């Protein structure tokens, strides 16, 4: 199977064979071979050759290609949504919203480029001070599996708009979505070599990240892989590295008047996408006492009725599956480990079918666990921690190396202002689900959650670098010379 797209041609990979599977049925959806290091090098050379011509095109020319890509996405919206649902397990209604986000990214990126990285000028003495931006050159984009269309798109679109050429390495769990997305770019008329698709697993990724011919790497994925990349790029200030990783995100619940509103917001924060959004609430901080007990009782009651099912099930489920049987096993093992170390199950996460990656929502009270691991459990397993007072809640919320998202459910604006001020996170919400984010706002975190604000409005900042110029059309000897210089 021709699984790679290099220099405008579909080619068979020469590396390790792999497949993508429907996580519910285990049906084979895609099969092919990954790119070898030699094929990665060929793709890098193709991108390098294509870069000057693409970068020299006018901005309007590049925008026209991006707009044609948006049109192609719309033309293939149903097919793309179904492919996303099949490979990730997310319900069709959610997959359709992902395609819509991909389309909307075009206009947002164009607006962002004009506002953040366009050209600005003004007088400075007898010259003109000009600020322009230039593309880095050849950049690699590593995509995740949870939003295999939208999140890589959030790097690729602004990178191409700025004039870079791109090497796209998608998750090995979602190669079919990546292939279909690249075909939409081809349909849009993107020149050969400007975007190259390198399918493959770990070895392909290692070869691409280590290739000396890339000028930068834009990554969305796990903190473990992101940390490896950060170490690999250490001592290389000549290469731009943008990392958007996960989080051990806290959602603090104050004693609010509307318990059902709190419960609904918690569910949307913890269990949407089967808990596979990097902004999902991982830790739920609940006050000690009778009110907190009532909240948890209602949360368990409602969560136990959440519909879980296949991506195309009708009526539509709220939750689909996690991405693979391996992911399901890791989550079930994590739950067992917590329970063995003193946690109390409030709602058991279960795997109804052994050969299916469908999991039911789980809620576990970990307050009594002495050494809680600061890790992202990427799935529908919510950890509850009881707190004595608001100061203790904020301290607990910040007790993590991550810093992606944090939220507060409270009727007190004063408490929110305190929470916002003292929270260490790139996204801080008040009375809204943690998983709600606007593409027009910066998306990303601090600490172990990453550096730049990847895949959103602020992506323009790392897709081009600023060039400051002082310009005047004529070279003129100044009337007053610097002391100590004589032209006589």
From Swiss-Prot:
InterPro entries from the entry?
A: Ald_DH/histidinol_DH, Ald_DH_C, Ald_DH_CS_CYS, Ald_DH_CS_GLU, Ald_DH_N, Aldehyde_DH_dom, SuccinylGlu_semiald_DH_AstD
Keyword annotations of the record: Arginine metabolism, NAD, Oxidoreductase
Question: Does Oxidoreductase count among this protein's keywords?
Answer: yes
> What are the protein's GO molecular function terms?
succinylglutamate-semialdehyde dehydrogenase activity
| Assigned EC number | 1.2.1.71
Q: In this entry, which stretches build a coiled coil?
A: none
What pathway does the UniProt record associate with this protein? Amino-acid degradation; L-arginine degradation via AST pathway; L-glutamate and succinate from L-arginine: step 4/5
What are the annotated disulfide bridges? none
* Active site residues of this protein: 244, 278
Could you tell me which Pfam families the record lists for this protein?
A: Aldedh
- Return the broad EC class: oxidoreductase
Write out the similarity annotation: Belongs to the aldehyde dehydrogenase family. AstD subfamily.
- Mind telling me what this protein is named? N-succinylglutamate 5-semialdehyde dehydrogenase
């Amino acid at each position: 199977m021709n699984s790679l797209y290099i220099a405008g041609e579909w080619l068979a990979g020469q590396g390790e064979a792999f497949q993508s599977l429907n996580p519910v049925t285990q049906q084979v959806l895609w099969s092919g071979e990954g790119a070898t290091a030699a094929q990665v090098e060929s793709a890098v050379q193709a991108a390098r050759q294509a870069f000057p011509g693409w970068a020299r095109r006018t901005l309007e020319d590049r925008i026209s290609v991006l707009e044609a890509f948006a049109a192609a996405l719309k033309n293939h919206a149903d097919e793309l949504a179904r492919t996303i649902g099949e490979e990730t397990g997310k319900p069709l209604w959610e997959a359709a919203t992902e395609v819509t986000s991909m389309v909307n990214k075009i206009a947002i990126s164009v607006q962002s480029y004009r506002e953040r990285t366009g050209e600005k000028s003004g007088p400075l003495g007898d010259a003109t001070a000009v600020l322009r931006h230039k593309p880095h050159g050849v950049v690699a984009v590593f995509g995740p599996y949870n939003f295999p269309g939208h999140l890589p798109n959030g790097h690729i679109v602004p990178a191409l708009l700025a004039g870079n050429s791109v090497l796209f390495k998608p998750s090995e769990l979602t190669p079919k979505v990546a292939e279909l997305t690249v075909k939409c770019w081809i349909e849009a008329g993107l020149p050969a070599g400007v975007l190259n698709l390198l399918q493959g697993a770990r070895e392909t990724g290692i070869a691409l990240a280590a290739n000396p011919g890339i000028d930068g790497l834009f990554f969305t994925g796990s903190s473990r892989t992101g940390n490896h990349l950060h170490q690999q790029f250490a001592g290389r200030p000549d290469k731009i590295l943008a990392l958007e990783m996960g989080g051990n995100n806290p959602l603090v619940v104050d004693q609010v008047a509307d318990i059902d509103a709190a419960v609904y917001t918690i569910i949307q924060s913890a269990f949407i996408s089967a808990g596979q959004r990097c902004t999902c609430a991982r830790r739920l901080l609940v006050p000690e006492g009778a009110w907190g007990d009532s909240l948890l009782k209602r949360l368990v009651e409602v969560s136990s009725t959440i519909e879980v099912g296949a991506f195309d099930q009708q009526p539509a489920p709220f939750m689909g599956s996690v991405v693979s049987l391996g992911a399901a096993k890791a989550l079930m093992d994590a739950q067992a480990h917590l329970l063995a170390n003193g946690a109390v199950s409030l709602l058991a996460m279960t795997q109804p079918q052994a050969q299916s990656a469908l999991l039911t929502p789980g809620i576990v009270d970990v307050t009594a666990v002495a050494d809680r691991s600061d890790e992202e459990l990427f799935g529908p397993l919510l950890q509850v921690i009881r707190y004595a007072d608001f100061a203790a809640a904020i301290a607990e919320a910040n007790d993590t190396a991550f810093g992606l998202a944090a939220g507060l459910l409270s009727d007190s604006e004063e408490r929110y202002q305190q929470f916002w001020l003292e929270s260490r996170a790139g996204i801080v919400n008040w009375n809204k689900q943690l998983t709600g984010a606007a593409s027009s706002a910066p998306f990303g975190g601090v600490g172990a959650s990453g550096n730049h604000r990847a895949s959103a409005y602020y992506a323009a900042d790392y897709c081009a670098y600023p060039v400051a110029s002082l310009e005047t059309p004529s070279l003129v000897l100044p009337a007053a010379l610097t002391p100590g210089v004589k032209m006589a």
